[in-house]
Regions:
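Membrane-embedded transmembrane alpha-helical bundles that form the catalytic cores
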Residues: 2-229
């Protein structure tokens, strides 16, 4: 299994135009399903997992292993606190569980400053997953979340479009939006808005970046070297 994962290509999120072609091809069936008021839940899971796995692999599986350990850790904490909140509401228990939820990212951020090496617990997206994990613990304590199903919890954490770049979201809002399929007119408006954002992203990341980095910057760099700057 590990050899198979190592052979998977590394697909950097938003790194090149090819990535967008993969995304469009993958989400087209999802959009068609929503257009006809259908959700292909298992297909959505497979799409998210495919992009997350290829985001974290590419000859190495250390980030994928770190994600697996992270998920196990957070699941144990959430299950414990969910059960605990059914009968009690101690503030120190809440503080402790929140701190334990933050522990992986604390190690990831502190270790390089201590010994100059990257933590084995680090992976792309750990910051956003930590915001979501702690947010769920807070919502459990506040009573915003009354019933937390593990399937919904993992779907929230591993939602591919916001895995590596956000934005930060709340479980309750995310879950309500997921269960509500937009009307066709609204869906088409959302599609048009998405296309507009993608075009702006292409303009900034690929066209302007190429003009500035490949056309304008080299002559300015040479001029600075010639003048001793």
């Amino acid at each position: 299994m590990m050899d198979f994962l190592k052979q998977l290509p590394h697909i950097e999120p938003y790194g090149n135009p090819q990535y967008f072609l993969y995304v469009i091809a993958a989400i087209l069936p999802i959009f068609i399903g929503l257009f006809f008021k259908k959700r292909f839940a298992w297909y959505e899971i497979l799409v998210s997992l495919f992009f997350i796995v290829t985001m974290l692999t590419g000859g190495k599986t250390n980030q994928l292993a770190a994600l697996g350990l992270y998920l196990i850790w957070q699941i144990v904490l959430v299950l414990f606190y969910k059960q605990y909140r059914k009968g009690r509401d101690g503030k120190w228990t809440f503080y402790l569980v929140s701190l334990l939820s933050l522990l992986p990212i604390i190690f990831v951020k502190v270790q390089p400053a201590i010994n100059g090496t990257q933590s084995l617990l680090g992976f792309v997206g750990i910051s956003y997953l930590t915001f979501r994990s702690v947010g769920i613990i807070i919502e459990l304590r506040d009573g915003v979340i009354k019933d937390l199903k593990m399937w919904e919890y993992l779907r929230f954490l591993l939602f591919m479009p916001t895995f590596s770049s956000g934005p930060i979201d709340r479980f309750k809002r995310f879950n309500e939006n997921y269960k509500t399929i937009p009307e066709r007119d609204e869906l088409l408006d959302m599609l048009a808005e998405s296309v507009r954002y993608i075009m702006w992203g292409f303009l900034y990341k690929f066209i302007l970046a190429h003009i500035l980095g490949e056309i304008l910057l080299p002559p300015l760099k040479n001029l600075a070297l010639q003048t001793g700057g």
